Amino acid sequence: MIDSKTVLLGLIGHPVEHSFSPIMHNAAINDLKINYVYLGFDISNENLKNVVNSAKTLSILGFNVTIPYKVEIMKYLDKIDDTAKFIGAVNTVKIENGEAVGYNTDGIGAKKSLEEEIGKFNNKNILMIGSGGSSRSISFELAKENEITIINRNIKNAKELSFEISKNLATKEYGEKYLKYGDLSTDISKFDIIINTTPVGMYPDVNSKPVIPLKNAKNDAIIMDIIYNPFEPVFLKEAKKYGLKTLNGLGMLIYQGAVSFEIWTGFKPDTNVMKNSIVNLLKS
């Protein structure tokens, strides 16, 4: 029951009406029987600068940050933890002793989701589609034990991210790795895992997909899309058409959310409860 002592958590982004985050976080809250509530806030770009001070004023404990503000939010924070600073993007903010502190849990969320599907992995050749905040966090996490190639419509952004990965995290000297879209017709067959980190195909633009020649992908490639609404984006439908194994963004959402939840509350949520809340919603 919400009362004057209820602690407020939330999600900021634009849009947010598609998000399952409130569903799964409130399910975890109810399961733990703690007096919290998690709400979604659709924030326009011009109002982003007011979010942090508003959270402090309203005694909001913390919030997730989603597309398109994971990078821009950083300039309004008081502190940023080393991992998020290294990545250059924030998806979790906690108000600690009057200061807004930024974290990033996306990378570990994506890794845990992949591990749930295929087990522990390393030395994989991975193609990352996109170079935004989500791509940065996932790339830096996976580059610790794998080889990452970036593809993006803006080749300059792809090159910059690839350079940062090569300079800071590569476990072996393989140099910068990035591609133009035109290169994929021949190069795509070398990738073990292909991950779409862009919002292309996300609700409400559900009929769009990245222009990637999946018909040329290797037979045992894993095709992941971090989108979870729709549950099966067009990109994954196409992958299935070619007999490829697919993974949507639900697992990543749950695992990154569980880490965020623990940062805010100190409680470890039951990820099965979080997952079932979304699965039951989709079934209904």
Curated annotation (Swiss-Prot):
For the ligand (shikimate), the binding residues are 19-21, 66, 91, 106, 228
- Pathway field: Metabolic intermediate biosynthesis; chorismate biosynthesis; chorismate from D-erythrose 4-phosphate and phosphoenolpyruvate: step 4/7
**Pfam families linked:** SDH_C (PF18317), Shikimate_DH (PF01488), Shikimate_dh_N (PF08501)
Which positions bind NADP(+)? 82, 130-134, 226, 249
Record has Ligase as a keyword: no
What EC identifiers does the entry list? 1.1.1.25
Q: Which InterPro entries match?
A: Aminoacid_DH-like_N_sf, NAD(P)-bd_dom_sf, SDH_C, Shikimate_DH, Shikimate_DH-bd_N, Shikimate_DH_fam, Shikm_DH/Glu-tRNA_Rdtase
Coiled-coil ranges per the record?
Answer: none
Q: Which domain of life is it from?
A: Archaea
Q: Where is the active site?
A: 70
Question: One MF term in GO for this entry?
Answer: NADP binding
From the record, give the cysteines joined by S-S bonds.
Answer: none
Q: What is the purpose of this protein?
A: Involved in the biosynthesis of the chorismate, which leads to the biosynthesis of aromatic amino acids. Catalyzes the reversible NADPH linked reduction of 3-dehydroshikimate (DHSA) to yield shikimate (SA).
Q: Assembly and partners?
A: Homodimer.
The record's annotation in HAMAP family points to:
Shikimate_DH_AroE
Protein name per Swiss-Prot or TrEMBL: Shikimate dehydrogenase (NADP(+))
Naturally occurring in which organism (per UniProt): Methanococcus vannielii (strain ATCC 35089 / DSM 1224 / JCM 13029 / OCM 148 / SB)
